[in-house]
Amino acid sequence: ASQIKEGGSLVLKKGLPVGFDPSAKYKSYTYSITEPADFCVENMELKDGYYQFDLKTPEFRIEKLVLNYPGLLNVENSVAASALALLAGVSHDAIRKALASYSGVKRRFDIHLKNENFILIDDYAHHPEELRATIQSVRDIYRGRTITGIFQPHLFSRTKDFAEGFAKSLDLLDEIVLL
């Protein structure tokens, strides 16, 4: 935060253990999809694999935004991106169009195969919270289906440092294959 220019803004996920300098010469905002914040999601619905929600801001509400890309992590990222865009002066209509046309990034909830028997999703969740969010999104979208995860740890140090978190997240799966 020390790099933020005077009159600038800091947008931070609500709940992060970060203190703010009350004498700072910038504005601080929070965002969340699960609890009240300066920028937050209300009335979120999952409809045929996409999310529709209202975005509440400090000054107004943008209703019925559509994110045509699955995953709660993507909803959270869209709230953060929308907050930044609004603070930079981007119009509500431009934000609505951008979210509706967003097609994702490679290896984030990337559906490679989908038929009536199974769905193959590739997701580079390299942190326990990202992994948890991805698994929860799969559970929400494909209710009642057996979920098998294939997990390939990357970086010995990351796996060691977050072993307990990875274990808790992977425990949300019905079946697991460790590579």
Task: Show where each model-derived region lies.
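Switch II (G3) loop of P-loop NTPases
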Residues: 120-126
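Short glycine-centered, acidic/aromatic-flanked micro-motifs in structured strand/loop junctions
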Residues: 67, 122, 151-153
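Conserved cofactor-binding/catalytic machinery of classical short-chain dehydrogenase/reductase
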Residues: 80, 126, 130
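Acidic, Mg2+-coordinating active-site environments of NTP-dependent enzymes
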Residues: 1-120, 144
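Active-site beta-alpha connecting loops in nucleotide-dependent enzymes
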Residues: 105, 129-132, 136-179
